[in-house]
């Protein structure tokens, strides 16, 4: 286990240890923008793999891959929210082992599953010699805490530590010791239990509000996990000119924020929509905010 200054540093370490400039990598599409930009900065050839309700689409994996890394968020695919079944995880591990492909497992939102028990990480299912597992405390505690970690196979421990020391040096000890004590005294588990209950209530509230106020405008993707939802715009409205970029811009005038779903795609966006975080929104404000969103979308439609 290597402690890092956030999950993004862990990604950069893995890239520098495993890849050369120009190597091909496989990323979920749509997927995490920060991951994509990290590989672009290393001049990698990026190939997108589509995702569905069960996360990454196994059938879309190349039969004879030339890429060196496959990046996955199996616990809660970002941004679409799909949760990868155990059988799919095992099949991907087998595919990677047979083809000499590294797996970069981003354990995004693993702590916040509301309607089912989390499945074991791919790193813990065997064949660990090709899996680099990345996690972070930023989302479960607070964003300003830049404290992450990576679990790496024995053969890359030394190069990963060397690379980390070269690019960033030591991770601040005060934060490490504070979090370690927080965990050891049982506060971390109590915090997760409390926040899981709170976020579950917010999750149910925002889903209900979207279904009530956004009928025929947008449909919420409901996976029972995480601190955000994805709203998929009605395709007919998009064909008529509704744009998620315009909606996000108009939302700012009402002090509301969201991310346009189209920006998470590598190339042409297959769907328009919004990535809506709810963790820092008061429970009582969720319904009125969704009503405001409805008015914003209707206004954008009349102006197209």
Where are these regions (language model features)?
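Conserved core of the PLP fold type I
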Residues: 1-99, 111-112, 117-132, 199, ...
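Conserved glycine-rich beta-strand-loop-beta hairpin in the small C-terminal domain of fold type I
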Residues: 1, 197-207, 218-233
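Short amphipathic alpha-helices in soluble, non-transmembrane regions
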Residues: 244-252, 289-294
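Conserved core segment of the aminotransferase class I/II
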Residues: 127-197
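Conserved PLP-binding active-site segment of the aspartate aminotransferase-like
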Residues: 152, 230-239, 257-298
């Amino acid at each position: 286990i290597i402690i890092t200054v956030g999950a993004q540093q862990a990604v950069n370490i893995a890239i520098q240890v495993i890849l050369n400039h120009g190597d091909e990598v496989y990323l979920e599409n749509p997927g995490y923008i920060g991951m994509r930009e990290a590989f672009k900065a290393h001049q990698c050839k990026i190939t997108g793999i589509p995702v569905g309700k069960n996360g990454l689409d196994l059938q879309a994996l190349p039969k004879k891959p030339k890429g060196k890394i496959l990046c996955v968020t199996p616990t809660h695919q970002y941004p679409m929210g799909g949760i990868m079944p155990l059988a799919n995880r095992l099949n991907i591990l087998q595919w990677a082992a047979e083809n000499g492909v590294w797996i970069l497992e981003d354990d995004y939102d693993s702590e916040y599953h509301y309607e089912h028990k989390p499945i074991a990480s791919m790193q813990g299912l065997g064949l660990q010699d090709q899996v680099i597992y990345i996690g972070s405390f930023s989302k479960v505690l607070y964003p300003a805490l830049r404290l992450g970690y990576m679990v790496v196979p024995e053969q890359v421990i030394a190069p990963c530590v060397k690379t980390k020391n070269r690019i960033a040096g030591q991770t601040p000890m005060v934060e490490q010791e504070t979090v370690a004590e927080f965990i050891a005294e049982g506060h971390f588990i109590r915090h997760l239990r409390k926040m899981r209950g709170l976020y579950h209530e917010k999750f149910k509230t925002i889903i209900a509000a979207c279904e009530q106020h956004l009928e025929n405008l947008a449909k919420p993707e409901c996976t029972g996990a995480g601190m955000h939802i994805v709203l998929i715009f009605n395709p007919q409205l998009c064909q008529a000119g509704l744009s998620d970029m315009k909606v996000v811009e108009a939302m700012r005038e009402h002090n509301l924020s969201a991310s346009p779903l189209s920006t998470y795609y590598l190339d042409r966006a297959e769907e328009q929509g919004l990535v809506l975080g709810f963790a820092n929104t008061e429970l009582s404000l969720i319904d009125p905010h969704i009503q405001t969103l409805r008015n914003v979308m209707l206004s954008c439609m009349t102006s197209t």
